């Protein structure tokens, strides 16, 4: 579960290393985001020469959460860290590589480009 002020690792090669969640998109009273949900975030740490800089406000999709999430078949999925992928125009990822596994929920939320770039879909 991701909410305001949550810090997330960045799972792509845009140059950002850490994000701070500003807002969960999808309704005025929406408090939490899970795998496949879009958030607005600020870049808190970035490497020099990357496509995003520290302080940039970006949209990102959550790809891993520490809090377990229940699936329709009754199983649960959880990861060791909270991570997100920065989005560019539309729902396409800004980077060209994705690092680490991503949840299968991204396929249901129509993030097919991220699913195809990811080394493993769990």
From Swiss-Prot:
Gene3D superfamilies the UniProt entry points to: Ribosomal protein L14
UniProt KW keywords: Ribonucleoprotein, Ribosomal protein, RNA-binding, rRNA-binding
BP-aspect Gene Ontology terms: translation
SMART domains listed in its UniProt record: Ribosomal_L14
Pfam families from the UniProt entry: Ribosomal_L14 (PF00238)
Any one Gene Ontology molecular-function term assigned to this protein's record: large ribosomal subunit rRNA binding
InterPro entries according to UniProt: Ribosomal_uL14, Ribosomal_uL14_bac-type, Ribosomal_uL14_CS, Ribosomal_uL14_sf
GO cellular component, one term: cytosolic large ribosomal subunit
Function: Binds to 23S rRNA. Forms part of two intersubunit bridges in the 70S ribosome.
Subunit annotation: Part of the 50S ribosomal subunit. Forms a cluster with proteins L3 and L19. In the 70S ribosome, L14 and L19 interact and together make contacts with the 16S rRNA in bridges B5 and B8.
Similarity section: Belongs to the universal ribosomal protein uL14 family.
Protein name: Large ribosomal subunit protein uL14
Gene: rplN
